[in-house]
Curated annotation (Swiss-Prot):
Keywords, sorted A to Z: Flavoprotein, FMN, Monooxygenase, NADP, Oxidoreductase
GO function term, MF aspect, one: alkanesulfonate monooxygenase activity
Keyword hit for Flavoprotein: yes
Gene Ontology biological process terms, A to Z: alkanesulfonate catabolic process; nitrogen utilization; uracil catabolic process
Signal sequence, start to end: none
Name of the protein in question: Pyrimidine monooxygenase RutA
């Protein structure tokens, strides 16, 4: 089972709460996080892109770094962990993204991959005059399909004459090409998004569901497998979970209850408002799940709350879901969370036993 870290490119990570750790994003923080993750043999690090936050008293996600430049820096200070940046495809022409990807591929010596997003939060793009109109909600995966086909031209031959509805290339060239194939990922849950991932992506990210219900996302993984079979490809799921762990279940639960009690209601109201803007894509989109009031304080990603031993067991349960190749992790406190994961959770996981055996001595004292 592969393990990755969803690094906090925006302020306060993924907890919309005044009772959660409050911090600004910085290169130094993310460098420490990714180097620590590499030390504990995490397989990859991913950063999102966010161009406008939710506001509220915590100013949630009002302060964000940029994904490609951050990951280029992190590629230069790591040696093994895979590095994924996110392209907000409405803001960056595919020829520029192809060249930036080739550059980070060079910096990382072949460790770079790309996450592509269509854009769901209208104010992010409207503020720059880049929103193409609300009809885009129903056409966004048509747009993204052309975008990726252009990328594939550049990474395959270094040249494109693509002529589509959204993109037209005229002997456009990108060189040098990547030294290794660029892995492409998407985070899709709608039917249109699943069809896109099945046709174009190497991996598809999905949300975990609920609190301490590690296999509840299984129907989503099954939908991807069905779509991939129809497309004649193999595409695996990577699932997003937040870990809130401590020495005992009671201590971990107390932290979770405190975070919920401090929920930033103004920021959450903004999220709910934005989730209703897309009336075209149906009820199964990521943003619909993010805004569900059940656990909106951490945008409704799956949450594992408990002792180190119980979290390890739930992580192993995730690994049993067919079609699941990896887990993307966030933490309430990233530095202490990764340390506790490496020292107290990973050594107890059957699904990471092969990794524990390869850790440096200082990282497997409890194994």
């Amino acid at each position: 089972m592969k393990i990755g870290v969803f690094i906090p490119i925006g302020n306060n990570g993924w907890l919309i709460s005044s009772n959660a750790p409050q911090y600004m994003p910085s290169f130094e923080l993310n460098k420490a996080i990714v180097q620590q993750a590499e030390h504990y043999q995490f397989d990859f690090a991913l950063s999102m892109i966010k161009l406008r936050g939710f506001g509220g008293k915590t100013e949630f996600w009002d302060h964000n770094l940029e994904s490609f430049t951050l990951m280029a820096g992190l590629a230069a200070v790591t040696s093994r962990i895979k590095i994924y940046a996110t392209a907000a495809t409405l803001t960056l022409p595919p020829a520029i993204v192809a060249r930036m990807a080739s550059t980070i591929d060079s910096i990382s010596n072949g460790r770079f991959g790309l996450n592509v997003v269509t854009g769901w939060q209208k104010p992010e793009y409207e503020q720059m005059g880049l929103w193409p109109g609300d009809e885009y909600f129903s056409r966004r995966y048509d747009y993204l399909s052309e975008y990726v086909e252009v990328l594939q031209d550049f990474w395959g031959t270094g040249q494109s004459d693509f002529n589509g509805e959204f993109f037209q290339m005229d002997d456009c060239r990108v060189s040098p090409q990547p030294q290794t194939p660029i892995k492409l990922i998407c985070a899709a849950q709608s039917d249109a998004g699943m069809a896109f991932s099945a046709k174009y992506a190497d991996y598809n990210f999905c949300f975990g569901k609920g609190v301490n219900t590690p296999t509840a996302f299984a129907p989503t993984a099954a939908r991807l497998q069905k779509a991939a079979e129809q497309a004649g490809r193999e595409v695996s799921s990577y699932v997003l979970f937040m870990i809130i762990a401590d020495e005992t279940d009671e201590l971990a639960r107390a932290k979770w209850e405190s975070y919920k009690a401090g929920a930033d209601t103004e920021a959450l109201a903004w999220l709910t408002e934005q989730s209703g803007k897309d009336t075209q894509s149906g009820a199964d989109t990521n943003v619909r799940q993010m805004a569900d009031p059940t656990s909106a304080v951490n945008i409704n990603m799956g949450t594992l709350v408990g002792s180190y031993a119980n979290v390890a067991k739930m992580m192993d349960d995730i690994a049993t879901v067919p079609g699941t190749e990896g887990i993307l992790l966030t933490f309430d406190d990233f530095l202490s969370g990764i340390e506790n994961f490496g020292q107290h959770i990973q050594p107890l996981m059957n699904s990471r036993a092969d990794i524990v055996d390869t850790l440096p001595p200082a990282a497997r004292e409890v194994a």
